[in-house]
């Protein structure tokens, strides 16, 4: 299968291999180069290509460098904007997975079971022998380290949001696609969602 190619404003070609997340604001792709990911902004489910919008967006992305974000703060900061599309290339921490993987639907787990990717715990299978979907969900919960791991990740996420808010910043689109995790630590993507508390925007979702 041919990989989709996306060109940045400096002429570098990036090959995408999978969609990490998709929502009303855009799509985030994992790239063949595991160190980077790409966000493409959408409007009405289509790419934004008019020159004025591209110019304004590039300016807003560049303005991120002037915000008081700590140098080693665990968030994917934009490296370069895209050519002829609203979006940017961002540094991606290796080994992190989106938080949505904690909440897989039984239908997804069922397909993974058929493909040999996922297996139901034997004890859970016996306990839920009359409810296969329940067995799938409980096995997934158990195999992703259960409640303790989830609480540690959410605690770390709360600390990250507090650190932003202590600088007068808010993260405006907190969802399962924008929060990544590894070893009970959280990592934020979509840094263009970071704004000053008093900054004007078309839409706000306060954390």
Question: Model regions: which residues?
Answer:
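Catalytic activation segment of kinase domains across protein kinase-like and atypical kinase folds
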Residues: 172-207
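Catalytic-loop of the protein kinase fold
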Residues: 154, 161-182
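ATP-binding glycine-rich loop module of kinase domains
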Residues: 16-18, 24-88, 95-144
